[in-house]
């Protein structure tokens, strides 16, 4: 969806401080909000459409984030591909998460290889490897204590290539979080 009824509570609070773009729909008197993220909406859709364990959905979200900190990677307008799948309670583990990440990276690498084979003009571009470095934000801060969180991310990727950063919103020993997270659904464990 491009917008949601405000009363559903399905629009993402992101870090809990970003203001939503809100407007009224004249003929219905409903207050609506332009989506900031589909995180909660995806989970509700999985339930509403009866997705089974191991199955999921993907979506192409177009959002407006009026309070986004703008830079060369971030804009007020967001076009984001995302996915969500149903898992069992006992699969809510770090090991399961890492296996899912590895399977996604493997699929991306296989797609990249196929594109290289199909389009000779891509031959000069390097291929990514399916190796993933997993690191928590605390481990990252310990490794690069004098860098900002964003500089740490850049440094670890330069050093290791494909990197999966874990526990992004958890408090660090320095007393500063690596980055903000939605207070009402992000799971830091």
Protein language model features and the residues they cover:
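Structured aminoacyl-transfer and RNA-binding surfaces used for tRNA recognition/handling
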Residues: 1-189
């Amino acid at each position: 969806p491009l917008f949601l009824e405000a009363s559903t509570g399905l629009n993402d609070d992101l870090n809990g401080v970003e203001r939503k773009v809100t407007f009224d729909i004249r003929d219905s008197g409903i207050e609506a909000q332009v989506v900031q993220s589909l995180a909660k909406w995806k989970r509700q859709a999985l339930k509403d459409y009866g997705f089974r364990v191991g199955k999921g959905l993907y979506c192409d979200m177009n959002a407006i984030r009026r309070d986004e900190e703008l830079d060369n990677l971030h804009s007020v307008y967001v076009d984001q591909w995302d996915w969500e799948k149903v898992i069992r309670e006992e699969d809510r583990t770090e090991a399961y998460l890492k296996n899912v990440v590895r399977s996604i990276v493997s699929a991306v690498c296989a797609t990249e290889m196929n594109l290289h084979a199909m389009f000779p003009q891509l031959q000069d571009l390097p291929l990514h490897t399916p190796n993933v470095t997993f690191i928590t934000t605390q481990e990252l801060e310990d490794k690069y204590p004098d860098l900002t969180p964003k500089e740490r991310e850049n440094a670890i990727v330069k050093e290791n290539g494909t990197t999966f950063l874990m526990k992004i919103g958890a408090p660090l020993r320095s007393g500063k979080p690596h980055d903000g997270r939605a207070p009402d659904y992000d799971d830091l464990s």
